[in-house]
Amino acid sequence: MVYRGFGLEYLSPPEKKAFGELSPDEQGERGAEMVVGFMSSCPGKSVISGATGFALGGVLGLFMASMAYDTPLHTPVPGGMSGAVQQMADLPLRQQVKLQFADMGKRAYSSAKNFGYIGMIYAGVECAVESLRAKNDIYNGITAGCITGGGLAYKSGPQAALVGCAGFAAFSAAIDMYMKSEDGRPPENDFKQ
């Protein structure tokens, strides 16, 4: 028999009710807890980073692809591409626009895939490293950058993997140092009169 007096019943966690037994407010709270729990997990962070990277990469790829058409189509391109450019200029305007939008879509999708892939891998590796080390410091990002950069370049050989590791680690360190630069103590003269 459990003693119920002097507030001792509040020492144990409340009994977990089935979802159907909860009030609408409690169902909303439980749903929000589940969403926050997923977003805080390593797979959740990885999926969110991948989706965000995909969206950002698509916008950036679309912008960069639109810059490829900043010269008139009849202008000769160095390297002997003037024949292909002249053929493009001979097409009707509607066909030219259709081809340009198709090319922009392909470039935007390619950029979106690359950014999404990099974001997903980096976030997953950083979260896993942080979970293994049980620390939140700059070395998690450096390690994740090295693993991500080396992993992306491993098919090109060990030298490329080493350069990718060093490059991603240095970039990650620079970004982390910038982002955490405001976490330090305020300057000595900040609060003096």
Swiss-Prot record:
Keywords: Disulfide bond, Membrane, Mitochondrion, Mitochondrion inner membrane, Protein transport, Translocation, Transmembrane, Transmembrane helix, Transport. InterPro entries: TIM22 (IPR039175). This is Mitochondrial import inner membrane translocase subunit TIM22. It is a multi-pass membrane protein. GO terms for biological process: protein insertion into mitochondrial inner membrane. It is found in: Mitochondrion inner membrane. The keyword Mitochondrion applies. Essential core component of the TIM22 complex, a complex that mediates the import and insertion of multi-pass transmembrane proteins into the mitochondrial inner membrane. In the TIM22 complex, it constitutes the voltage-activated and signal-gated channel. Forms a twin-pore translocase that uses the membrane potential as external driving force in 2 voltage-dependent steps. The gene is TIM22. Belongs to the Tim17/Tim22/Tim23 family. One of its GO terms (molecular function) is mitochondrion targeting sequence binding. The chain crosses the membrane at residues 47-67, 138-154, 159-179. One of its GO terms (cellular component) is TIM22 mitochondrial import inner membrane insertion complex. Pfam families: Tim17 (PF02466). Component of the TIM22 complex, whose core is composed of TIM22 and TIM54, associated with the 70 kDa heterohexamer composed of TIM9 and TIM10 (or TIM8 and TIM13). Disulfide bonds join C42-C127, C146-C165.
